[in-house]
């Protein structure tokens, strides 16, 4: 019998919740740690309450890192199109405003609720 991976994800924002959902879908036993009273709380204020969850224009200059190659490596492995695809699979459809991607509902709560539903599965 294959041993289940055990993973701890620190932070219950968009990235943490998405990482936890993805790991669980891959069969991992996931523990999501969040210091706030609920996961997804910070999502509700991102993008002025609309949740700008990714950007079409991603360049290494937009990110800070001691390793100048690190942002480029991450962007190559997980580009905006892959994020859009992942979110659409969960039922979050995009609205593009000059390269800034929001949920079609324009409500950050729809992103938080959908991610929480995915976590609860």
Pin down the residues of each PLM region.
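Beta1/beta-strand and adjacent pyrophosphate-binding region of the FAD-binding site
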Residues: 2-15, 31
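Feature captures the FAD/FMN-dependent oxidoreductase FAD-binding
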Residues: 77-121
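Short beta->alpha connector loops at strand-helix junctions that form conserved
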Residues: 34, 55, 98
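Small-residue (primarily alanine) positions within well-ordered alpha-helices
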Residues: 15, 19-24
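N-terminal glycine-rich dinucleotide-binding loop that anchors FAD/FMN and/or NAD(P) in oxidoreductases
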Residues: 44-77, 81
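Short, contiguous strand/loop micro-motifs
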Residues: 6-7, 69-73, 102
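Glycine-rich FAD pyrophosphate-binding loop
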Residues: 8, 24-48
